[in-house]
Amino acid sequence: MATYLIGDVHGCYDELIALLQQVEFTPDTDTLWLTGDLVARGPGSLDMLRYVKSLGNSVRLVLGNHDLHLLAVFAGISRNKPKDRLTPLLEAPDADELLNWLRRQPLLQVDEEKKLIMAHAGITPQWDLQTAKECARDVEAVLSSDSYPFFLDAMYGDMPNNWSPELSGLARLRFITNAFTRMRYCFPNGQLDMYSKASPENAPAPLKPWFAIPGPVSEAYSIAFGHWASLEGKGTPEGIYALDTGCCWGGELTCLRWEDKQYFVQPSNRQMDMGEGEAVNA
């Protein structure tokens, strides 16, 4: 009964299956955690969603910014870009079923027994765990409702970038979405910076990676996240696990077996390009 945590797949379905075969993943007894961004860039987004959906209770996933963008394309709000390679998924006979399932997936996973949390981009140091849970539920409730296109149309944007319990309406939902799915850097007070994508050693002062700023969640729980491929899984404090290693850019797909903290990797089938590219609101 093992727990396997895997970074952003981005439609690299063949690499995912090869990695799961490598670790001898058994859905009947094991659990698979996925950091989000299941789709886009790689050629297998349709197969990816079909497979993950078929796993039922054997998978625990969180939504990433590319998953939300796919939902916006599906709702007719955003444009389908050829480089995202989403057309086979959008035109599939089971597209409605798959995407309505996808929009009902969470932004946050918490395992109290393991003291383990997963979110696509991480957890802002401005939140305690109760706030993070409440904020995740706010967005999840809208996404799973009939009014989800209205939210998706308003989610794009960088402001507000500072948390306050007084935030309400679409401004509150946009901050929550950015914190869970787009965050990389923060100011020392925890305020989000939505612009810098430099590597941590080249980040302009006073910005710091979100995980370098102490917060109540990171002090009590381990946190697994994806989103930040240029970290290459390195440079995080103890208990913080960066799992996106850029498979869709030609890097690797990385898996962490939680019980013994052993890593496994599957090389990408694509040519190396570790740049972040033109990610969606990334």
UniProtKB/Swiss-Prot annotation:
Name of the protein: Bis(5'-nucleosyl)-tetraphosphatase, symmetrical
Keywords: Hydrolase
Family: Belongs to the Ap4A hydrolase family.
The keyword Hydrolase is assigned to this record: yes
Catalytic reaction(s) noted: P(1),P(4)-bis(5'-adenosyl) tetraphosphate + H2O = 2 ADP + 2 H(+)
E.C. designation(s): 3.6.1.41
Domain of life: Bacteria
Function: Hydrolyzes diadenosine 5',5'''-P1,P4-tetraphosphate to yield ADP.
Gene3D superfamilies, A to Z: 3.60.21.10
Organism expressing this protein natively: Salmonella choleraesuis (strain SC-B67)
GO molecular function list: bis(5'-nucleosyl)-tetraphosphatase (symmetrical) activity
